[in-house]
């Protein structure tokens, strides 16, 4: 497993592990990193995180466990094909979650593992941003206070380069509904009703910032 990885691949895993919990919180779903075992019939759970932003029952943490590959057909397909895979997974009897699996690739495009997002209410844009965080997080920022774990009371919005809000979680929508902005997606952060100049500043500098405000 780890002994077969290059230094680049190991460094990437260490960085991802540091912010895996935050990615789970953002995606409102369980996030798991899988690595191939020497025995091709098994896969190794390198790290697994449950979201703090979602209340309810959670599964046992499988970190450090070996799992038969036949029990994870979506993971097997992603590892074999070096491509993203989407499907359903039974959470409980008759209850299914959406599971999306993405290959982990190094700088040469070689697949050395897979990462899955499992959630009952997937938002493709927010999952994509969570994956972006994991894939491109600089090691120097993993201890930055702005990248701490989230809570159920935290709102999430995804803003495009034009300051257009293209995705938001239910908490963010509720927060702005109280401010009489019932349709948050499609608004701009520089609209008069929202007026968040901090977003534009972060886009210009590429540096995370924070500011407290009353709603």
Explain the meaning of each model-derived region:
Residues 8, 62-64, 89:
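A generic structural signal for short
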Residues 30, 100-101, 155:
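Conserved beta-strand and immediately adjacent loop positions that scaffold enzyme active sites
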Residues 69-130, 174-215:
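Sensory/regulatory domains in signal-transduction proteins
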Residues 36-37, 42-70, 135, 144-147, ...:
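PAS-family sensory domains
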Residues 21, 75, 170:
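Short glycine-/small-residue-rich flexible loop motifs, especially phosphate/cofactor-binding loops
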Residues 2, 18, 43-55, 76, ...:
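N-terminal membrane-sensor/transducer module of prokaryotic signaling receptors
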Residues 1-9, 13-14, 114, 118-158, ...:
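Juxtadomain coupling helices with adjacent low-complexity linkers
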